[in-house]
Amino acid sequence: LLAGPALEGGRPTLKLDLAPEAAPAQMLGRYKLLEKIGEGGFGEVWMAEQREPVKRRVALKIIKLGMDSRQVVARFEAERQALAMMDHANIARIFDAGTTDTGRPYFVMELVQGVPLTQYCDQHRLTLQERLELFVPVCQAVQHAHQKGIIHRDIKPSNVLVTLLDGVPVPKVIDFGVAKAVGQRLTDNT
């Protein structure tokens, strides 16, 4: 399924034709795919292990096989560019991006291992005050995106994951898949 890594325009590329039920432990450049952790209409998100220059767990998002129309690719590229423009503690960070040798773009981002906002609040029986305090950083993250000219357009509990950092709950906004740029274009195709 996979060919050895190559470079195209300075970015790693290789052949990757994963079926949704493909076995894990395949390589995509310096990333070892471990487990599919999410799937949307056009893309799949895999937990992966970055092998170099540092070892760490990451999330790798790639367009589904057969869904690589111009419109879908443009939307995908807009999402990764939107993420690249933002630097906020409550927005999942992008680390890397590339294209397989079959033209399927992917990007690598911070792995947020958490649960949806409402699930966290319900499981921990948070009071209204505690829920509001947990939601303030979400509002700050959305404001940061707006200051960068990015509108998320899909804020919902499943796109705000709560993870623990040193025992403290930290909400993270994820999935800028339908984000829109205001007053600018994210890519030449959007």
Place the predicted regions along the sequence by residue.
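Negatively charged linear elements and acidic catalytic determinants
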Residues: L1-R11
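Conserved ATP-binding/catalytic core of the eukaryotic-like protein kinase fold
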Residues: L14-T190
